[in-house]
Swiss-Prot record:
InterPro entries: Actin-crosslinking (IPR008999), FRG1 (IPR010414). Homodimer and homotetramer in solution. GO terms for cellular component: Cajal body; catalytic step 2 spliceosome; nucleolus; striated muscle dense body; Z disc. It is found in: Nucleus, Cajal body; Nucleus, Nucleolus; Cytoplasm; Cytoplasm, Myofibril, Sarcomere, Z line. One of its GO terms (molecular function) is RNA binding. Pfam families: FRG1 (PF06229). Residues 1-37 are annotated as: Disordered. The gene is frg1. This is Protein FRG1. A motif (Nuclear localization signal) lies at residues 22-30. Binds to mRNA in a sequence-independent manner. May play a role in regulation of pre-mRNA splicing or in the assembly of rRNA into ribosomal subunits. May be involved in mRNA transport. May be involved in epigenetic regulation of muscle differentiation through regulation of activity of the histone-lysine N-methyltransferase KMT5B. It comes from Xenopus laevis (African clawed frog). Belongs to the FRG1 family. Residues 17-30 have a biased composition (Basic residues). It comes from the Eukaryota.
Length: 210
């Protein structure tokens, strides 16, 4: 028995258990990837991730559930937060995005006026045409976004509750989300050409037409 006491104890390795740790790591990695791909949605409004997704009807969220709200006097403020996650922006919080270049857009309010800035950096919506002051540049960095005005300042809200572009740097108060209600293209799960999908007979027909 003395010989047995000198034997170094070790964990019993059973068949099929050896790669358990690796499998758990794979599952964790897949779960993290899935979380990254998960859409940030409020109602049917999803948060854009790049400039190419900005088009059509959009809303600009300044704080959780609180959107830029157009007033009938041509000014803008931050609307009351929508507490329900399924509640999207109201009509005064919806704008039409018009691409002007590979990095700039114009934004048109529901009152038919383009958003711009005055000489003091106050965001106003009183223009019937797009000029230099009605151009905006969404800036993306490490998963966050800010909106740069033509005066090279970022959009935020001042103490009076007015929307302004007066900050040369983008802090937490200048972080935004642009939400779109456009229908998203379904993500492809494979690289199989469309003509290769379907049964054999259908594939033959597809290639005949090709």
């Amino acid at each position: 028995m003395a010989e047995y006491s000198k034997v170094k104890s070790t964990k019993l390795m059973l068949k099929g258990i050896k790669n358990k740790s690796k499998k758990n790591k794979d599952k964790k990695r897949k779960r993290e990837e899935s979380d990254e791909d998960k859409l940030d949605i409020a109602g049917n409004w999803w948060s854009v991730k790049n400039f190419g997704e900005i088009s059509g009807t959009v809303a600009i969220e300044m704080d959780k559930g609180a959107y830029i709200h157009a007033l009938d006097n041509g000014l803008f403020t931050i609307g009351a937060p929508h507490k329900d996650d399924d509640d999207g922006p109201s009509p005064p919080e919806q704008f039409t995005a018009i691409k002007l270049s590979d990095s700039r857009v114009a934004l048109k309010s529901g009152y038919g006026k383009y958003l711009g800035i005055n000489s003091d950096g106050l965001v106003i919506g009183r223009s019937d045409a797009i000029g230099a002051r009605e151009q905006w540049e969404p800036v993306f960095d490490t998963g966050k976004m800010a909106l740069l005005a033509s005066n090279s300042c970022f959009v935020g809200c001042n103490e009076e509750g007015d929307l302004v572009a007066q900050s040369k740097t983008a802090g937490e108060g200048e972080m935004i989300k642009i939400r779109s209600c456009a229908e998203r293209e379904a993500k492809r799960d494979d690289d199989i050409p469309n003509e290769d999908k379907g049964n054999v007979k259908q594939c033959e027909i597809n290639y005949v037409y090709v």
